[in-house]
Regions:
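Histidine-centered nuclease catalytic patch
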Residues: 40-78, 87-105, 109
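Short, charged surface segments at domain edges that flank catalytic/cofactor-binding sites
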Residues: 1-37, 60-71
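Hydrophobic, aromatic-enriched interface-forming segments
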Residues: 114-119
Length: 119
């Protein structure tokens, strides 16, 4: 898995943080920085990449969307339909996983000829 650099919050021409009113608006900025690749499986997709929330916007058991997660640039990655749906809406303990935007995942996995992946 390739490491990803999301970078700082995108800014407008005046140097102010861009305000996203919907999380899907971050897609273009994410693609500029990460490319048209799923952050997890690295599949190249030019049209069906979704903005993935690392921490779910409405975790299991929550009665409402958590506003701080919904539009937070640092909570976004790009994901294909399969990877986006696999994670579901469970809260994530970030230190329990390797993340392409936080860890050097390039050397974290070994791929065998038969398709087995070892961490």
């Amino acid at each position: 898995m390739r490491p990803i650099v999301r970078g700082n919050w995108p800014t407008n021409t005046a140097g102010e943080n861009i305000v996203f009113t919907e999380y899907q608006q971050a897609r273009g900025e994410l693609i500029k920085r990460m490319g048209e690749l799923c952050s997890f499986c690295e599949m190249h997709l030019d049209t069906s990449l979704a903005v993935e929330h690392v921490q779910p916007k409405q975790p299991i058991g929550a009665t409402a969307i958590i506003a701080a997660r919904l539009l937070d640039w640092h909570n976004f990655l790009l994901a294909c339909t399969n990877c986006n749906s696999t994670k579901s809406n469970k809260d994530v303990i970030l230190d329990d996983y390797l993340w392409p935007d936080r860890d050097n995942t390039y050397h974290s996995f070994a791929y065998s000829e038969g398709g087995i992946v070892n961490a």
